[in-house]
Regions:
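Arg/Lys-rich, positively charged N-terminal/basic patches that mediate binding to nucleic acids
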Residues: 1-31
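Enriched for short, Lys/Arg-rich terminal
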Residues: 3, 26, 41, 59-62, ...
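Residue-level recognition of oxygen-bearing side chains
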Residues: 11, 52, 83
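Active-site micro-motifs of SAM-dependent methyltransferase domains
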Residues: 14, 38, 83
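A short, surface-exposed loop/turn module that caps and links secondary-structure elements
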Residues: 33-58
Length: 96
């Protein structure tokens, strides 16, 4: 069975990932590869109060917020739980 193709919003690559401590970066990368590649719905929770059908994966105090589109998993933001949800309004899944 083929897994999801994991794609990153450009701001995740340019801002979120570089801002992470290297140890946290490794933990998040391992969690994405282990938990989101095949059955992301089993490991993440849907976000309430959003019409975009977004999901959040918990990695300790850090969150990976993503959207599913067909077999694509778009990571929209990665950040500390206290501030990660503030970025969502400015980050959307790019058009198909």
């Amino acid at each position: 069975m083929a897994g999801f193709v994991i794609l990153y919003h450009r701001k995740v690559v340019s801002a979120d990932i570089p801002a992470l401590d290297p140890a946290v970066r490794r933990r998040i990368k391992a969690a994405i590869e282990a938990k989101l590649l095949f059955h992301p719905e089993e490991h993440a929770k849907p976000l309430a109060y959003t019409t975009a059908r977004l999901w959040a994966l918990r990695v300790g105090d850090w969150r990976v917020v993503f959207a599913l589109r067909n077999r694509e998993l778009w990571i929209l933001t990665i950040g500390h739980r206290s501030e990660v949800y503030e970025h969502l309004s400015a980050r959307a899944v790019p058009p198909a």
